């Protein structure tokens, strides 16, 4: 559906609205980074798959998504650990707002 960018780590020219609308599909768009796939699965309500994707992404992006997921789960101590690993302050925004912030940031980085 969306081509992989030259680094093979994300989508090419995918907008936020396209990403959000893609969550009606049965599977994530081809070429998503593991961090974005985690957020895609979270939008589908599948925390387990979201967490698995975040765990597979070894970098800062995966740590950020991992932090968000543990905060959403209610595991604040684990979330704080992952925010620190991601180099981000612990988020206090509503979950929807944080999800939007992370998705937009990762789409921008991976375009």
Residue ranges of each PLM-predicted region?
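N-terminal amphipathic/basic-hydrophobic helices that include classical n-h-c signal peptides
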Residues: 1-13, 36
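TPR-adjacent "capping" and linker segments in tetratricopeptide-repeat scaffold/adaptor proteins
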Residues: 18-31, 52-55
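TPR/TPR-like (Sel1-like) alpha-helical repeat modules
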Residues: 58-59, 74-93
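Terminal, low-structured helical/coil segments at or just beyond the last alpha-helical repeat
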Residues: 95-111
